[in-house]
Amino acid sequence: MNYVNILEKSKNFIELELVNDDHSLSNLIKEVLLSKKGVILASYGVEHPVLDPDTGRYISNPTIMLKTDEKTDAEKVLKEALKDIVDLCNKTLKEL
């Protein structure tokens, strides 16, 4: 089973679904995307979550939407944002 499903994709727009997740990662990705040059819209939506009896977490399948200007490739910006998040996590691990 995939963790990420691409729902729609073009040069300047991408919408993806995170399977069995909550607000945490979606919100982080959105915030980093909003700091990127060429991003017109970065948002996410979460339908009503359900309680996972195994983990005690409320989960859903959040969708992340990214729209860029015509000069900016949406997939490239998304990959840059994800790399920035990984770099931040690695930096934090080194400092602990």
Curated annotation (Swiss-Prot):
It is found in: Cytoplasm. GO terms for molecular function: DNA binding; DNA-directed RNA polymerase activity; protein dimerization activity. Coiled coil: none annotated. GO terms for biological process: DNA-templated transcription. It is an enzyme of class 2 (transferase). One of its GO terms (cellular component) is cytoplasm. Its EC number is 2.7.7.6. Keywords: Cytoplasm, DNA-directed RNA polymerase, Nucleotidyltransferase, Transcription, Transferase. InterPro entries: RBP11-like, RBP11-like_dimer, RNA_pol_Rpb11_13-16kDa_CS, Rpo11-like. Gene3D superfamilies: RNA polymerase, RBP11-like subunit. It catalyses: RNA(n) + a ribonucleoside 5'-triphosphate = RNA(n+1) + diphosphate. Its main location: cytoplasm. HAMAP family: RNApol_arch_Rpo11. Belongs to the archaeal Rpo11/eukaryotic RPB11/RPC19 RNA polymerase subunit family. DNA-dependent RNA polymerase (RNAP) catalyzes the transcription of DNA into RNA using the four ribonucleoside triphosphates as substrates. Part of the RNA polymerase complex. This is DNA-directed RNA polymerase subunit Rpo11. The lineage of its organism: Archaea, Methanobacteriati, Methanobacteriota, Methanomada group, Methanococci.
